[in-house]
Amino acid sequence: MGYGHYEPLRHYAEVHLRLSPAPRGSGISFDSECPTDILAQNWQNLVRTHVFEKKHKGVLTGSELCDVKVTLLTGRSHLKHTEGGDFREATYRAIRQGLGTIAASGQNDTAGALLRFSISLESEQAGRLMADLQRMECSFGSPQMEEERMILEGRGPAAVLSGYGREFISYTRGKGVMSFWFDGYEPCKHQQEIVEQIGYQRERDLENPSCSVFCSHGAGFPVPWDEVQNYIHCK
């Protein structure tokens, strides 16, 4: 569950979302289980728009959120104070709050980008190349020989392949050729190492807040993501 509330003075919106894992490569999808007599259709349409209008960041590494189904469960507007931008704030915060809750429960997966590659080099350097690819946990097919050169095709993690070029150029003396194509995402095998290496601090990402804003005595005040459930208005 993700809860987002946005209520500085003379503004109001609250959104409750369910975040569910989706099939790999399916991207972000949206559905609503909220009756229109609870939250009017025009506000629900805005929530949907705000789900799709930006690339939402995950809370572990700040990487783009992918392969998630977002379901609107309930929400609330205010007849006098709600403006269109209020549901943008509430929706963004609900997604981040939900991701924080999932991460705290240990159920969050970090997806790493994959690259498909084609590498051509002199056959005498083939052993070094294949040993390096195995070390980087890449998969590849059988080598193809063209005169005195070998061509190898496969796929592997972008995080390691993208930094391999300098080493490759060095031991092939500039005679090797590498070509890469993006090939989707898959769960990282070494998630904790990657999280520590990137060092993303979500509390400092002011453009993607996880907290909500409530109002008391005519003034808005922030509530940390892990306390929002104690303050929400929709039950």
List the predicted regions and their residue ranges.
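Accessory interaction regions appended to the cores of large information-processing enzymes
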Residues: 1-235
